[in-house]
Design a protein with these regions (language model features):
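Short aromatic-glycine-(Arg/Gly/Cys) micro-motifs in beta-strand/loop hairpins
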Residues: 2-24
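Short, mixed-charge low-complexity intrinsically disordered segments
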Residues: 45-81
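A broad, structure-centric signal for solvent-exposed, well-ordered loop/edge residues
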Residues: 19, 37, 77-80
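A short, exposed loop/beta-hairpin motif centered on an aromatic-Gly-Thr core
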Residues: 21-33
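Intrinsically disordered, low-complexity boundary segments flanking structured domains
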Residues: 1-2, 14, 37-41, 56-59
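A short, charged, amphipathic alpha-helix used as a generic interaction element across diverse proteins
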Residues: 30-49
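Ordered hydrophobic segments in well-structured contexts
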Residues: 9-13, 27-29, 49-54
Length: 81
């Protein structure tokens, strides 16, 4: 698939405490890298952990790939390789 078939997006994922560690909450979109980091910082006190990511989104399927961590606050699970 070509790069043109992908779109860069910024997302923030809050994580709540769960019996097995942490569980992801609702993904929040951001308009920029700076915005994602700002949102993550503002949410940090309300969750066990928060992470801001830059991801490539397949325009056809909506699948997210190649996450890059922009900010990680509190307890956040490791990205799968």
């Amino acid at each position: 698939m070509s790069e043109a078939a992908h779109l860069v997006q910024y997302i923030v994922v809050p994580y709540r405490a769960a019996a097995e560690g942490v569980a992801p909450g609702e993904i929040r979109p951001a308009s920029s890298e700076f915005g994602a980091i700002r949102i993550a910082n503002s949410m940090a006190s309300k969750f066990a952990g928060v992470a801001a990511y830059e991801v490539l989104v397949d325009k056809e399927t909506g699948d997210m790939q190649s996450p890059r961590i922009l900010a990680q606050i509190g307890t956040v699970p490791a990205l799968d390789d």
